[in-house]
């Protein structure tokens, strides 16, 4: 009998997507084939503290989170903020990590750094790709260098804010712009801006979430198109999906995504001219490779009235809730939810195996390096 792979499913986190992460984790847990996998649960609280399997399971099973967390804190070694994390290292039976932590901590390279320290395989992109893809400014710099179309923008910080009055923004970008924190997910802190008063209010709010703010040129009445990517060195793309928001809503915001999605319509697969489908697919795959992403990503596009696509944002750990488009786009492309989860695990194992062959100490290379003398220590 083949030994089961022991999966650690990590969820929660200290971002605004804490509850979304819990819903994603439930779906992934249900989709994991228990004939193949043993599963342990580890939840990061809203304070960013990691709970063990027993307490995480209680919350997973529906016990009041605040009560379970309070009781867990009382019995937990809080002498060092690293204590709960180091306790994870003692779980020697864990073979593989499946993070479902959206936003900061989960998508900014932090949790990936922990997995690297623990020397364990995991689902998704590595530290660098996660960090670059989570920072909207870095993403735009990289995809622009790769020749991928995206909207013009400027970066506003507390230090240069005086240089970017609304008059200057309007001159550079026009009178329809979007103000966005550079490192936030799920449309948190994003504002549609058309005048000086809105601009000042938007900056004040966005600075609550980050000290680097993007002000992007807006596109009037765009189509919001999404595509799912799966793979490592040779990624594949799903069929495209569209998000149709109510006409009274300016864009697909946090409210639409997580509070009241009743007016949102998903078109799967979306009907677009084939040349446009091909262009978006090519842009998405090119961006995936340029950013060094692995495992999976959902990539968002805006398409203007002339059917010109602009790459919006990549998401290295997309949602897996009942309304999340990432798994739905694969469903309509012929890959079931459970098969998708299996593939993601296999991709993580393959990437770990590939990276394990890299030598980090040149003294151990000896004569393997062509044209270099064998290293001899004195």
From Swiss-Prot:
Q: What is the uppermost EC class here?
A: ligase
Q: Does the keyword Nucleus apply?
A: no
> What reaction gets catalysed by this protein?
2 D-alanine + ATP = D-alanyl-D-alanine + ADP + phosphate + H(+)
User: What pathway, per the record?
Assistant: Cell wall biogenesis; peptidoglycan biosynthesis
InterPro entries, per the entry: ATP-grasp, ATP_grasp_subdomain_1, D-Ala_lig_Van_CS, D_ala_D_ala, Dala_Dala_lig_C, Dala_Dala_lig_N, PreATP-grasp_dom_sf
| Family listed | Belongs to the D-alanine--D-alanine ligase family.
Name assigned to this protein: D-alanine--D-alanine ligase
Gene that this sequence comes from: ddl
């Amino acid at each position: 009998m083949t030994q089961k792979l022991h999966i650690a499913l990590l969820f929660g986190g200290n971002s605004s997507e804490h509850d979304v992460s819990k819903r994603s984790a439930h779906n992934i847990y249900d989709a994991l084939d228990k004939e193949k996998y043993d599963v342990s649960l580890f939840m990061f609280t809203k304070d960013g503290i990691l709970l063990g399997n027993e307490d995480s399971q209680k919350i997973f099973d529906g016990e009041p989170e605040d009560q379970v967390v309070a009781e867990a804190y009382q019995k937990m070694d809080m002498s060092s903020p690293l204590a709960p994390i180091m306790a994870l290292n003692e779980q020697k039976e864990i073979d593989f990590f499946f993070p479902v932590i959206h936003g900061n901590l989960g998508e900014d390279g932090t949790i990936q750094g922990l997995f690297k320290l623990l020397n364990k395989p995991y689902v998704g992109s590595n530290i660098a790709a996660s960090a670059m893809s989570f920072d909207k400014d870095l993403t735009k710099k990289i995809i622009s260098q790769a020749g991928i179309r995206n909207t013009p923008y400027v970066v506003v910080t507390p230090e240069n804010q005086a240089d970017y009055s609304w008059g200057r923004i309007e001159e550079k970008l026009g009178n329809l712009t979007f103000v966005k924190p550079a490192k936030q997910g799920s449309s948190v802190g994003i504002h549609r801006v058309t005048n000086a008063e809105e601009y000042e209010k938007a900056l004040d709010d966005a600075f609550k979430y980050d000290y680097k703010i993007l002000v992007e040129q807006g596109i009037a009445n765009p189509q919001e198109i999404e595509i799912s990517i799966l793979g490592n060195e040779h990624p594949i793309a799903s069929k495209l999906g569209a998000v149709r928001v109510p006409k009274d809503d300016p864009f697909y915001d946090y409210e639409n995504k997580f509070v009241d999605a009743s007016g949102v319509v998903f078109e799967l697969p979306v009907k677009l001219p084939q040349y446009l489908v091909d262009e978006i697919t090519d842009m998405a795959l090119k961006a995936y490779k340029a950013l060094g992403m692995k495992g999976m990503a959902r990539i968002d596009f805006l398409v203007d009235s002339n059917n010109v696509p602009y790459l919006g944002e990549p998401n290295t750990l997309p949602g897996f809730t009942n309304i999340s488009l990432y798994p739905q786009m694969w469903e309509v492309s012929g890959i079931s939810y459970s098969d998708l989860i299996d593939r993601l695990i296999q991709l993580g194992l393959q990437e770990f195996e590939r990276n394990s062959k890299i030598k980090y100490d040149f003294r151990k290379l000896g004569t393997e390096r062509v044209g270099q003398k064998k290293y001899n220590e004195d």
